[in-house]
A protein has these predicted regions:
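Ligand-site clamp/hinge motif
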Residues: 11-60, 187, 196-198
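Detector for C-terminal structural segments
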Residues: 3-5, 10, 77-78, 101-131, ...
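Short helix-loop capping/hinge motifs at secondary-structure junctions, enriched
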Residues: 14-17, 86-94, 158-159
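Second-shell loop/turn segments in exported
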Residues: 26, 83-87, 94-97, 132-141, ...
């Protein structure tokens, strides 16, 4: 059908003789996650890249001898991005209370199917040289709804006659089943401490516009990759120069602190990993107190392919398509 796929044809003049091995690659666009899995099972697809693979199907394909899976080694965190210009979310004490009200281990086990792990910092702990082991949200903000209520009381956010303290508009990408399930779990946890949550699911394009252009949200669920280095993938979520309305995946929380800007800049420019780590360690300590985002989960990115496909997992984040080949 016109418009539902792209066909890539082998370049016979490719610089490396004999490659690529495949005559053509057909990339199909399949919107519904369940339809992608059905197409895989029917043999209509040979490979689903991690971004499009629904995690709720992991056990199904992992236990099927027709398929092979691999976790992509690419540190990625799912954040709850906070609109820090919207009261009472502008108060770090309120954000800390919201973190304490979250059972992130429950979300990891029941939403992300035990894959990945609860995030322990704004820095993915898999970036071992830059992660500060003294910053651990599991220890700093353990799940404790009674304590969260007390923290909100101390912040001056008292419960009304109906038990409600304030209301959050929670925007998420409704095309991702894991985001829907995570949003529903978070709604329950926060409502347990008197915070009413209006869930607002929308398609990705609508969500991105409302978040990054219109700033029309209280909290939103987004996934940020680290791009392999804090200077590339982490700083953009927290430095002042990344507050750019209309530009996606930047500092949409609009958090701004000169000390944090300075530390990220020094961490970027330092000449050794040891020196860079010194600045990044300090910035994590500050962000752990300010919590402009609530880091939810260190994601496991899963690729799946037919066992007929070879060398498909050889390229790290993306396949090296020139060496991929298939059984006939």
């Amino acid at each position: 059908m016109r418009g539902d796929h792209i066909t890539l044809v082998r370049n016979d003049k490719y610089w490396q003789q004999g490659r690529p091995y495949l005559d053509r690659i057909i990339a199909k666009f399949i919107g519904a996650p369940s339809s992608r899995i059905l197409a895989l099972q029917a043999g209509e697809l040979d490979y689903i890249e991690y971004y499009w693979f629904p995690l709720d199907s992991y056990k199904l394909v992992a236990n099927d001898k027709r398929f092979q899976t691999a976790e992509v080694s690419y540190p990625t965190i799912t954040h709850l991005l906070i609109n820090t210009k919207q009261p009472p979310l502008d108060n770090p004490k309120v954000r800390q209370a919201l973190m304490v009200a979250l059972d992130r281990n429950y979300i990891q086990k029941n939403v992300f199917f035990g894959l990945g792990q609860p995030a322990v910092s704004t820095f993915d702990s898999r970036i071992e040289w830059a992660y500060n082991p003294k910053v651990n949200y599991e220890k700093m903000y353990p799940y404790d709804p009674a304590k969260a209520k007390a923290m909100l009381d101390e912040a001056g956010i008292k419960a009304g006659a109906d038990g409600t303290r304030f209301t959050i508009n929670f925007l998420f990408d409704s095309t991702r089943p894991d985001f829907l399930q995570a949003a529903q779990a978070i709604q329950r946890f926060w409502q347990d401490v008197g915070v009413k949550v209006n869930l607002q699911g929308a398609e990705r394009a609508v969500t991105l516009k409302r978040v990054y252009t219109d700033y029309d949200f209280g909290v939103t669920l987004q996934t940020y990759t680290t791009s392999g280095d804090p200077a590339l993938g982490i700083a953009r979520a927290f430095v002042t120069e990344s507050i750019k309305q209309g530009s996606n995946f930047n500092n949409v929380s609009r958090y701004s602190k000169p000390e944090v800007d300075d530390l990220f800049n020094k961490g970027r420019d330092a000449s050794s990993r040891e020196e860079r780590a010194k600045y990044y360690y300090r910035v994590q300590e500050i962000l752990a107190q300010d919590l402009p985002t609530l880091t939810l989960h260190q994601d496991a990115l899963i690729d799946v392919a037919s066992v007929r496909v070879h060398n498909i997992f050889s390229g790290g984040q993306f396949p090296l398509w020139d060496i991929v080949w298939m059984d006939k």
